[in-house]
């Protein structure tokens, strides 16, 4: 396991209302549950995949 110190900060900008349950669960997995909330996570392939799944509901603040 690598110990990466790279972090990525994301913010929820849209509501998951009317979206599939899997997208709501992904937002919760990312630590987001209300519009305007921010979460700072370790930059890993798993997190990048989750971000890609709900990219239309969030905004990446810090990171690539």
Swiss-Prot record:
GO cellular component labels: cytosolic large ribosomal subunit
UniProt key word RNA-binding: no
Gene3D superfamilies in UniProt: Ribosomal protein L30, ferredoxin-like fold domain (3.30.1390.20)
Pfam families, per the entry: Ribosomal_L30 (PF00327)
SUPFAM superfamilies, per the entry: Ribosomal protein L30p/L7e (SSF55129)
Gene Ontology MF terms in the entry: structural constituent of ribosome
GO biological process, one term: translation
Signal sequence region: none
Database matches in InterPro entries: Ribo_uL30_ferredoxin-like_sf, Ribosomal_uL30_bac-type, Ribosomal_uL30_ferredoxin-like
Keywords of this entry: Ribonucleoprotein, Ribosomal protein
Entry annotated with the keyword NAD: no
Highest taxon of the lineage: Bacteria
Assembly information from the UniProt record: Part of the 50S ribosomal subunit.
Entry's family note: Belongs to the universal ribosomal protein uL30 family.
UniProt-recorded name of the protein: Large ribosomal subunit protein uL30
Name of the encoding gene: rpmD
